[in-house]
C-alpha cells in the first residue's frame, strides 16, 4: 500500500502552496547539509574513548601501621 505518483504530486503541490517554492528549496538544502554532516561525523574515528580504554586503571592506596596496645 504505497503512495501512487499522483498522490505524491498532490502532496508536493500542497507543500508548495503552504511553504512557497523558495522556502522549500532552502529547507531541502538545510536537510541535505545536515545529512551530509551526520554521515561525515559517523565516518570519523573516535580517539578519546580508545585512549582511555588502553590505559590500565590506577588504584591509589595509603598504607598505615596500627600500633599494638597492651591491655
Swiss-Prot record:
Membrane topology listed for this record: Single-pass membrane protein
TM region(s), chain numbering: 1-21
GO molecular function list: protein transmembrane transporter activity
Disulfide bond entries: none
InterPro entries hit by this protein: TatA/B/E (IPR003369), TatA/E (IPR006312)
Chief localization: membrane
Compartment annotation: Cell inner membrane
Keywords, sorted A to Z: Cell inner membrane, Cell membrane, Membrane, Protein transport, Translocation, Transmembrane, Transmembrane helix, Transport
Entries under Pfam families matching the protein: TatA_B_E
GO cellular component, one term: TAT protein transport complex
GO biological process entries: protein transport by the Tat complex
Domain of life per record: Bacteria
UniProt similarity note: Belongs to the TatA/E family.
Quaternary organization: The Tat system comprises two distinct complexes: a TatABC complex, containing multiple copies of TatA, TatB and TatC subunits, and a separate TatA complex, containing only TatA subunits. Substrates initially bind to the TatABC complex, which probably triggers association of the separate TatA complex to form the active translocon.
Function (record text): Part of the twin-arginine translocation (Tat) system that transports large folded proteins containing a characteristic twin-arginine motif in their signal peptide across membranes. TatA could form the protein-conducting channel of the Tat system.
PANTHER family: SEC-INDEPENDENT PROTEIN TRANSLOCASE PROTEIN TATA (PTHR42982:SF1)
Protein name: Sec-independent protein translocase protein TatA
Taxonomic path: Bacteria, Pseudomonadati, Pseudomonadota, Gammaproteobacteria, Cardiobacteriales
Gene from which the chain derives: tatA
Amino acid at each position: 500500500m504505497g503512495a501512487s505518483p499522483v498522490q505524491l504530486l498532490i502532496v508536493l503541490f500542497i507543500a508548495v502552496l503552504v511553504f512557497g517554492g523558495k522556502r522549500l528549496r532552502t529547507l531541502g538544502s538545510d536537510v541535505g547539509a545536515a545529512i551530509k554532516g551526520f554521515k561525515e561525523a559517523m565516518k570519523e574515528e573516535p580517539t578519546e574513548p580508545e585512549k582511555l580504554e588502553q590505559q590500565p586503571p590506577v588504584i591509589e592506596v595509603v598504607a598505615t601501621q596500627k600500633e599494638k596496645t597492651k591491655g
